[in-house]
């Protein structure tokens, strides 16, 4: 209701405060909103200029402060388009422009809601300028909590936390996971915003004191994160793990048109590794990990495919975690699975993980009849992938693995469930053949956060790259190139302890989002009080 808006021209007179901040002129607010999105974009891989994330937060806050709600929505939407359209450009490489445009606009819609919320709380932060940073952090966490879950299970790509893979703030994931990192980034942005707003009380040199304190607080928050420990209690044991990146005949959606060639690539790369082991030039792995879609031929039903995988497992003398597409359980349905293949005995059906969060409109089509009215391309997804029901805890023998497949690494609960189930090592099986190197590096940034969050060594195995290993403090080693065949080995320590983030689970996010709701309610009370003051003065 526009009657409850914090009027931009009369509020200072009603409150009797000539120093109250006013909205930026629209000619400045619009470019500020666009620059906010671009600044945040540059914070993410492949650019990785992480300090720009809080700068983007500050610019968006400045653009929408004291705006009417519709203007806040529009400016937030501009920020969202500037951020998500280029970030998600890899979605149009092989599927056309429509999915990219629709997904980008949908994600931008959540920043439009954030713009509304930020404009709504303007009277609160005008009265309590020192609350501005905290309020900013709370609203960002609440926005991401909503975006991560809706619609159809949400799409967490582009969370502020995932821009901090090389930042000291990454260590905060050890305490409270991705939501706490997002809160810290947005809080830092709020500190910059409060420091940079143009009208502070005080006309002399003392007017710079609050500015200096806020900037110092932003720097202290970032630097202080280095004091947060990483890792978790270990078992004292290590395992040697080989990641096989077999590559594909060609990039794009039709990579699986040569399914046998993709399988052969991974078998042959493993046989080459086995030959190196026998020759004494390479260490023998305790475990081998193949990526998602390394066998798009169901090896449980196709004897030839099963024999080829067994050939590789027997040659290397170690279990292989195979990314496979399995037919069933019903006609027209399939499963995206990680299945353990043991030397000598073959498939271990007791150690099979089925992807719990298939990607909507890519691995299954919700509301297919309606979706077909928008685009006939939905029928490219001929078979719907069936979600699994159990966490990806795979007991390989040498180690207990926490397996997630592709985009699942972006979802807090799916990864945490594997650690709660006893995972000693995190594994991400992924197929980036339909995307590009930017998407792969964005995904690797998520793996780094998960490693710190749960105090576990982690690895990412991709069909085409980037594959690599991550230590519990977030450092990457053995990263492969893109669109190449590679086999990388590392000795990895096993951990069975639990970090504070693992223990508290979803509660920090719930608490921060709940406080955001309370802030919105409090701001509503101030708006009603303002309206009564205006009415009384007439």
Residue ranges, per PLM feature:
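Membrane-embedded alpha-helical bundles of multi-pass enzymes
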Residues: 2-227, 436-437, 447-450, 463-464, ...
């Amino acid at each position: 209701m526009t009657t409850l808006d914090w009027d931009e021209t009369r509020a200072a007179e009603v409150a009797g405060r000539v120093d109250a901040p006013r909205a930026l002129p629209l000619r400045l607010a619009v470019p500020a909103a666009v620059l906010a999105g671009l600044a945040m974009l540059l914070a993410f891989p492949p650019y990785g200029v992480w300090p720009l994330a809080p700068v983007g937060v500050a610019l968006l806050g400045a653009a929408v402060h004291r705006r009417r709600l519709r203007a806040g929505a529009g400016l937030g939407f501009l920020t969202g388009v500037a951020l998500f359209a280029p970030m998600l450009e890899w979605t149009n490489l092989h599927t056309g422009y429509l999915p990219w445009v629709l997904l980008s606009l949908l994600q931008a819609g959540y920043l439009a809601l954030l713009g509304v919320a930020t404009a709504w709380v303007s009277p609160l932060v005008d009265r309590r300028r020192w609350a501005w940073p905290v309020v900013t952090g709370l609203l960002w966490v609440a926005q991401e909590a909503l975006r991560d879950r809706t619609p159809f299970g949400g799409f967490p790509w582009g969370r502020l936390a995932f821009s901090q893979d090389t930042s000291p703030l990454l260590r905060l994931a050890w305490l409270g996971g991705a939501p706490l990192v997002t809160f810290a980034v947005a809080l830092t942005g709020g500190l910059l915003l409060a420091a940079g707003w143009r009208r502070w009380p005080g006309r002399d040199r003392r007017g710079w004191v609050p500015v200096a304190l806020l900037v110092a607080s932003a720097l202290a928050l970032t630097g202080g994160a280095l004091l947060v420990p990483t890792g978790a209690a270990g078992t004292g044991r290590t395992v040697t793990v080989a990641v096989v990146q077999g590559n594909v005949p060609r990039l794009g959606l039709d990579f699986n048109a040569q399914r046998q060639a993709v399988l052969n690539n991974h078998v042959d790369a493993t046989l080459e590794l086995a030959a190196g082991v026998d020759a004494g030039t390479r260490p023998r792995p305790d475990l081998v990990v193949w990526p998602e879609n390394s066998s798009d031929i169901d090896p449980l039903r196709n004897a030839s495919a099963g024999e080829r995988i067994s050939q590789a497992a027997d040659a290397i003398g170690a279990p292989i975690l195979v990314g496979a597409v399995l037919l069933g359980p019903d006609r027209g349905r399939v499963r995206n699975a990680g299945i353990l293949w043991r030397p000598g005995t073959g498939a271990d059906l007791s150690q099979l993980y089925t992807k719990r969060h298939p990607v909507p409109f890519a691995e299954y089509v919700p509301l297919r009849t309606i979706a077909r009215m928008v685009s006939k391309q939905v029928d490219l997804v001929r078979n719907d992938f069936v979600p699994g029901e159990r966490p990806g805890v795979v007991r390989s023998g040498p180690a207990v693995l926490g397996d997630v497949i592709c985009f699942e690494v972006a979802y807090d609960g799916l990864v945490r469930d594997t650690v709660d189930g006893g995972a000693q090592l995190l594994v991400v099986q992924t197929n980036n053949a339909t995307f590009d190197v930017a998407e792969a590096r964005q995904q690797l940034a998520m793996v780094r956060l998960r490693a710190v969050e749960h105090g576990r060594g982690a690895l990412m195995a991709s069909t085409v790259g980037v594959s690599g290993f991550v230590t519990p403090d977030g450092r990457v080693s053995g990263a492969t190139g893109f669109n190449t065949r590679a086999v990388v080995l590392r000795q990895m320590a096993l951990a069975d302890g639990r970090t504070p983030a693992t223990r508290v689970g979803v509660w920090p996010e719930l608490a921060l989002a709940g406080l955001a709701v309370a802030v919105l309610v409090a701001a509503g009370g101030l708006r009603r009080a303002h309206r009564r003051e205006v009415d009384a003065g007439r």
